């Protein structure tokens, strides 16, 4: 689990693409301080498992489903990425609950400066927008942000200068693709309120049970 508070920006050094997967080698610093094989690191909001590392880089596999659902398929050498280690049990919860499981990608549809605030508008698919609420939390490329406004086709967030300086979102422009993860609490609430929609049709009815002596 992560919190959406980016620890540092890393740089992709190598992208080894397979038929339906890829292996990323990423240059980093802070996130390598206590890393071990098998640890989770969020890369632009995508939870990846460390498969090897040295003092300056780490390597992680990216599976077919992740490539299809996230922007990692577009990553190239020298691309900057947001990095966050999994939250320790005694860590501070600075953002919100982030699973590192990207729901879909969105596209930056607008960006404007308002005094010291940077407003970003993101177009998102319906399956994402259904869980986006005003004043709620949204993860954009691994960054925990507060939703300022929502429409039928997009949502807006306001970014402070510090976030722009220490994350990749500061250099994003209109038309760029970003990873989106909605607040998982909303998904659980929906399932609790509508449990029948998740159940598959069954042939075991009351009449069936009575017929066989139950």
Model-derived features: where do they sit?
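Conserved loop->alpha-helix
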Residues: 1-214
């Amino acid at each position: 689990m992560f919190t959406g508070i980016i620890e540092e920006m890393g740089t992709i050094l190598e992208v080894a693409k397979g038929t339906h997967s890829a292996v990323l080698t990423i240059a980093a610093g802070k996130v390598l301080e206590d890393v071990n094989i098998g640890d989770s690191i969020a890369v632009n909001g995508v939870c990846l498992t460390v498969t090897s590392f040295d003092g300056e880089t780490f390597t992680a596999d990216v599976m077919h489903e992740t490539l299809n659902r996230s922007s990692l398929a577009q990553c190239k050498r020298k691309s900057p990425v947001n990095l966050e280690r999994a939250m320790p049990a005694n860590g501070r919860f600075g953002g919100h609950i982030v699973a590192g499981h990207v729901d879909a990608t969105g596209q930056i549809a607008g960006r404007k400066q308002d005094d010291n605030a940077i407003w970003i508008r993101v177009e998102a698919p319906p399956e994402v927008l259904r869980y986006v609420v005003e004043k709620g939390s949204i993860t954009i490329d691994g960054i925990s942000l507060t939703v300022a406004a929502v429409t039928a086709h997009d949502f807006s967030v306001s970014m402070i200068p510090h976030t722009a300086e220490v994350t990749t979102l500061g250099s994003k422009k209109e038309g760029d693709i970003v990873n989106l993860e909605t607040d998982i609490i909303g998904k659980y609430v929906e399932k609790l309120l509508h449990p029948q929609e998740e159940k598959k049709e069954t042939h075991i009815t009351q009449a069936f049970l009575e017929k066989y002596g139950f």
